[in-house]
A protein has these predicted regions:
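Transmembrane helical elements of multi-pass membrane transporters/channels
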Residues: 17-36, 138, 149, 172, ...
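Helix-terminus/linker motif at the lipid-water interface of multi-pass membrane proteins
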Residues: 31-50, 119-126, 182-189, 246-279, ...
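Short alpha-helical transmembrane segments in multi-pass integral membrane proteins
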Residues: 1-19, 77-142, 188-239, 295-364, ...
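Transmembrane alpha-helix boundary and packing residues in multipass membrane permease domains
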Residues: 22, 26, 38, 75, ...
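Residue-level hotspots within pore-lining transmembrane alpha-helices
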Residues: 24, 28, 32, 62, ...
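Short runs within selected transmembrane alpha-helices of multi-pass transporters and secretion channels
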Residues: 70, 139-157, 165-173, 194-207, ...
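N-terminal transmembrane alpha-helices
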Residues: 6-44, 60-72, 76, 101-108, ...
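Small-residue-rich hydrophobic transmembrane alpha-helices
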Residues: 49-109, 146-165, 269-333, 369-391
Length: 448
């Protein structure tokens, strides 16, 4: 199986080539998310779309917590691989497996019983509450599948392998679309069918990744790691990354609650825009994953010169990419939104107008989001999860402040720029923090 040593070679070429499969994988992931939404909205109507939309941030929180934990748990693997220490890599992989299982069980035990109350707190409209709760229950039960895939994909990325997760995501996407058609349109399972299709697709992707991880025979542990330090180190990185995503999602839920006050059609427009949000940040997320691996391996090898050069180049690449995507979405935004909102549905014109207003506000400020991902992931790869968590806290504060204050003065239009304010709050923390760390790499290395 292919592994990639990112401590040697041209920095920008390594990062870009590593991120390309991730980008394609994210495109396929967004494809099956989009297909979910299109099938649900076209076959079940605007209210079904709104039911998914009002639970978007709640379901994202569970998935993002699991993803954050998996990514944090895998950072020590990248460090160990950068130093070419096989024994250390084996212990890190063994520790990740145990931590992944335990953390998912604890997460479900805490959150699952609270889901109905959270949806009530979000002011979910009564006419879509049952469907929203059913969909959320399925997604949360499926977090075991989500962790299964993300833990294995994170291990592969730590070894510099971004192609296998791409192949896994292609398989998952194709299966998800087929299962959507079968469960939602064929068997008439309704909104639950869309959730079940997603969970099964994650399981298949995880099995594919597991097959390829097992090919790393010299790195596969033969026993469970019993050194408590390894468990502490992974949780030291994984928990702050998970909490960072919790803070972001809480802010998103506050925003959703504010959106819910303005009715189902405003919510449907917001939901359609949110589905395109994933498309907006595909490249940003991919560059981010690449930087976690790149900075992680070079940090383990003490190649601080390569870290400085790589971050500088990926920031410029991110800005150029974001400007190009902004132009495309500004021009073709109405067409993309029309994929989610059927013109024959009740309230379709209103929903389209609201969705377009949200989308255009985000596209203007998209470079800020790309800077956020570039700097946050670089800092995480440097074995510092605290600063990204603090940036998540500032995102939360900005989202809550914007969602509560701006509508007082501007009505529903005040909700359009709230997401942008959250990005600004995070960047204010991340950018100066990274350059402070860059000036003190040797001290940071000794501390971490």
């Amino acid at each position: 199986m292919q592994v990639k040593d990112m401590t040697k070679g041209n920095e920008l070429k390594l990062i870009f080539l590593f991120s390309l499969p991730l980008m394609l994988g994210n495109i396929f992931q967004q494809l099956y998310t989009v297909c979910d939404t299109i099938i649900v909205s076209r076959h079940l109507g605007v209210k079904a779309l709104a039911a998914i939309g009002c639970s978007d941030w709640l379901t994202w929180m569970g998935i993002a917590v699991v993803t954050g934990l998996a990514q944090g748990f895998s950072i020590p693997i990248a460090h160990a691989f950068g130093t070419h220490d096989k024994s250390n890599v084996q212990k890190c992989i063994s520790t990740l497996a145990v931590n992944a299982i335990v953390s998912t069980v604890v997460l479900l035990a805490v959150i699952y019983p609270l889901l109905p109350n959270i949806l009530i707190l979000l002011k979910t409209p009564a006419d879509i509450m049952d469907r929203a709760l059913a969909y959320t229950h399925v997604i949360y039960i499926g977090l075991f599948a989500t962790m299964f895939y993300n833990a294995l994909a994170s291990i592969l990325r730590a070894f510099g392998n971004s192609k296998t997760p791409l192949q896994a995501m292609i398989i998952a996407s194709i299966c998800n679309v087929g299962l959507d058609v079968l469960f939602v349109m064929g068997l008439e399972w309704g909104i639950i069918g869309a959730g079940v299709a997603t969970v099964i697709a994650q399981i298949l992707a995880g099995c594919f990744c597991l097959y390829h991880v097992l090919k790393l025979k010299e790195y596969i542990p033969t026993s469970i790691c019993k050194d408590v330090i390894y468990y502490k180190n992974q949780f030291r990185l994984g928990i702050p990354m998970a909490l960072q995503n919790v803070l972001i999602s809480i802010g998103g839920m506050v925003l959703t609650s504010a959106v819910n006050r303005y009715g189902t059609y405003f919510l449907a427009g917001f939901t359609a825009m949110n589905k395109l949000y994933g498309v907006l940040e595909i490249s940003a997320v991919s560059y981010g994953y690449a930087m976690v691996t790149y900075t992680g391996q070079n940090y383990g090898a003490h190649r601080y010169d390569r870290i400085k050069s790589g971050v500088k180049k990926v920031v410029l690449l991110s800005l150029a990419t974001s400007i190009l995507i902004s132009i495309i979405l500004w021009i073709f935004g109405p067409f993309f939104l029309s994929c989610f909102i059927s013109k024959t549905s009740e309230g379709a014109n209103e929903a389209m107008t609201y969705g377009l207003n949200f989308l255009r506000c985000l596209t203007v400020f998209l470079p800020i989001l790309y800077m956020l991902h570039a700097y946050r992931s670089s800092i995480q790869g440097l074995s510092n999860a605290f600063i990204p968590m603090v940036s998540g806290l500032f995102e939360l504060l900005m989202r809550i402040s914007g969602a509560l204050i701006l509508p007082i003065y501007f009505g529903k239009a005040g909700l359009y720029p709230v997401e942008v304010l959250a990005w600004i709050g995070a960047v204010i923390i991340l950018v100066p923090s990274y350059y402070y760390m860059e000036r003190n790499f040797q001290k940071v290395s000794e501390k971490c």
